[in-house]
Design a protein with these regions (language model features):
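The canonical Cys-X-X-Cys-His
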Residues: 104, 113-125, 198, 202, ...
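Electrostatic cytochrome c docking/interface patches
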Residues: 85-112, 218-264, 362-369
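Small disulfide-bonded, cysteine-rich extracellular recognition modules and tandem repeats
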Residues: 121-124, 157, 182, 226, ...
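Extracytoplasmic electron-transfer domains, predominantly the class I c-type cytochrome c fold
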Residues: 135-205, 279-355
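Short sequence/structural segments immediately N-terminal
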Residues: 59-69, 89-94, 101, 113-117, ...
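N-terminal export/targeting leaders of redox proteins
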Residues: 1-98, 207, 214, 219-230, ...
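Sequence context of c-type cytochrome heme-c attachment sites
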Residues: 49-59, 83-93, 98-113, 120-123, ...
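Inter-heme linker and motif-flanking segments adjacent to c-type heme-binding CXXCH motifs
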Residues: 127-132, 187, 204-214, 247-255, ...
């Protein structure tokens, strides 16, 4: 509303100014026509000018009135501009966000609709999680086989990653996975603005968070202190408990570590267990895209359980130190807006079980370090 009002006022001022200049030009041209040929009698530069009474009287007053009129215009228009400019700016930002979201949706769409088929792998335009075909090669035998790779849901990706971290993933992809590099800088087809519009679209499909007093934008229902909606968190815990009750996992912490909800979007095993993403898991927590969590490495990095919980909650930041000898890369997502502190504690307790298993193996002579 403010933006349209200020635009209307600007148009009115412009039209008045143009009309004034047009009137001045027309009057000047018309008055000059009467002087054609008069220079034969008396040159224009020899005509007597206004006398002092006129110059210091009516003409001076007319100029002063014009000056006062312009002063009134400036006095009114400048404060009006200051009042309306924030609204105009907000309207412009909303317009850009709306257009970028629309353009991003066109890129996210299936190939048949002219997009780059992000929706094809990630579970439709709402990106609720899907499956991507991928070929892997056994490094020992050279055998090539086709697998179905779990492509995670993206409707909570802004819960866990910043815009810059998502941009990095889009630009360079995820090595050794179906996620290709899409940005020009990483060898892909998308310009920097294309990537920006994709991120704007992903913002628009985020699940609205609980505890959001002020969302980040009209098309971005997330916020700094937001949390996964209670109904979604309840569904996560129900699935974890079901896995425990069925005997698939021994504890809720183990079930959360290996959670398959939304194609593993909330799973630790996706990055820390090789083969988990295509249902051929190797050593649990043994390392893949993420570091090895077994062999006591997690305890050496985080001697205090509270420090590990804090790290998992906040994720890593590029260049920022963590733990005892860690420096962040930005690849470790923040799970603090997905899981509660109690749920994170259950996951950490499960990770610490790797250390207990190591001690038991050493005690029984299973292997030697």
């Amino acid at each position: 509303m403010f933006a349209s009002t200020s635009t209307s006022i600007a148009w009115v001022i412009l039209l008045i100014s143009l009309a004034g200049w047009a009137f001045y030009a027309f009057s000047n041209i018309r008055s000059s026509r009467g002087e054609i040929g008069s220079e034969q009698k008396l040159a224009a530069n020899r005509k007597p000018y206004y006398d002092d009474e006129i110059l210091e009287g009516p003409r001076l007053e007319r100029v002063q009135i014009l000056g006062l009129l312009f002063l009134v215009i400036i006095t009114i228009s400048l404060p009006l501009y200051w009042v309306l400019e924030p609204g105009r700016t907000a309207g412009a930002e909303f317009g850009f966000e709306k257009r970028f979201t629309k353009w991003g949706a066109e890129l996210f769409a299936p190939t048949a609709e002219g997009g780059f088929n992000c929706s094809g792998c990630h579970g439709g335009m709402k990106a609720t999680g899907g499956v991507a075909s991928y070929a892997i090669t056994d490094p020992k035998t050279g055998e090539v086989k086709s697998v179905s790779w779990k492509a995670p849901a993206l409707n909570t990706v802004l819960y866990r990653y910043t815009d810059d971290e998502i941009r990095f993933i889009l630009n360079y992809g995820r090595p050794f996975s179906p996620m290709s590099a899409w940005g020009i800088i990483g060898g892909g087809p998308l310009t920097d603005q294309n990537v920006t519009t994709l991120i704007e679209y992903m913002k628009s499909i985020q699940i609205p968070q609980d505890n959001c007093v002020e969302p980040r934008g009209p098309y971005n229902p997330t916020c700094v202190d937001g949390k996964l909606p209670a109904v979604e968190n309840k569904a996560i815990m129900a699935e974890a408990q079901r896995q425990v009750d069925s005997g698939t996992y021994a504890t809720v912490g183990e079930a959360l570590f290996n959670l398959n909800v939304n194609s593993g979007a909330y799973s630790c095993a996706r990055c820390h267990t090789k083969g988990w993403s295509y249902d051929d898991p190797q050593a649990t927590g043994g390392g893949a895209f993420g570091p090895n969590l077994t062999g006591g490495s997690s305890v050496r990095q985080f001697p205090n359980q509270s420090d590990m919980i804090s790290f998992i909650s906040g994720g890593s930041e590029l260049g920022k130190r963590y733990g005892e000898q860690g420096q962040g890369s930005g690849r470790m997502p923040a799970f603090g807006q997905v899981y509660t502190d109690e749920q994170l504690k259950l996951i950490v307790e499960y990770i610490l079980c790797f250390v207990v298993q190591l001690v038991v193996l050493k005690a029984h002579g299973g292997f030697h370090l």
